[in-house]
Amino acid sequence: MKKDIHPKYEEITASCSCGNVMKIRSTVGHDLNLDVCSKCHPFFTGKQRDVATGGRVDRFNKRFNIPGSK
């Protein structure tokens, strides 16, 4: 194996905008500032909302009164 070809793998701090701070290991080489993390992302917190945008199929089913449509 060749020596000194791999990037330096070191511990860095990842700080989220919600205030959560995590120590992780990475080859980035500097601390990270995150917008969202598992503590504040709606998918992980259970505060996500369902977006029912409908669409062309729903509009078609409504227009022609297709059985089984919503």
Swiss-Prot record:
GO terms for biological process: cytoplasmic translation; negative regulation of cytoplasmic translational initiation; translation; translational initiation. InterPro entries: Ribosomal_bL28/bL31-like_sf (IPR034704), Ribosomal_bL31 (IPR002150), Ribosomal_bL31_A (IPR027491), Ribosomal_bL31_sf (IPR042105). Changing residue 18 to S: Binds Zn(2+) normally. Keywords: Acetylation, Metal-binding, Ribonucleoprotein, Ribosomal protein, RNA-binding, rRNA-binding, Zinc. Zn(2+) binds at residue 16. One of its GO terms (cellular component) is cytosol. The modification N6-acetyllysine is found at residue 8. One of its GO terms (molecular function) is rRNA binding. Its cofactor is Zn(2+). Binds the 23S rRNA. Part of the 50S ribosomal subunit. This is Large ribosomal subunit protein bL31. It comes from Escherichia coli (strain K12). The gene is rpmE.
